Amino acid sequence: SEVMIRTHNLQVQSKNYFICIKDSALVIEVLKTIKLLSDENQWGDFGTVNKLIVQNMCCKRAFLRGAFMVAGSVTNPEKGYHLEIAVLSAKLAEQLKEEMSAFEIDAKIVERKKYQVVYIKEGAQIVDFLNVIGAHMALMEFENVRIVKEVRNSVNRQVNCETANITKIVNTAA
């Protein structure tokens, strides 16, 4: 077996990782282990991941991590809070939402073009998701931006309140 990495020409950051297994018996063993092939050598349902694979919390985390790495994105928190995973199958989107709910993450699903998009809009929920999938550095960067935004908003609210109070006092005195 060997691992190969291919970089996309259009996106410098984007890499695909491939595991090349040359031994056919080992390929069958791997396919059976991940439940894509039954013990009777029948193909499984490609629309979802077999429930036996995602029974444990560690497996749920790995499943969500893999889905996010393959088909996910998160917007710059300075612009807004939005995390999404775009998949082709409605059943897989429902499964992703279900696995997120095991970690008390309330995701939504919307259809966009040919994709089912599982998304989170709330900042705290995005932080929880990043923690679940083990993206701790991204979580810290996200939180730092969130904290700065909250402080700015708080200061702006206080300034607006003080300005309104001063305006009321001036208007009352006049």
Question: Predicted regions span which residues?
Answer:
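DNA-contacting interfaces and partner/effector-binding or oligomerization modules
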Residues: S1-E2, R6-R146
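Extended mid-to-C-terminal alpha-helical interaction segments
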Residues: V132-A174
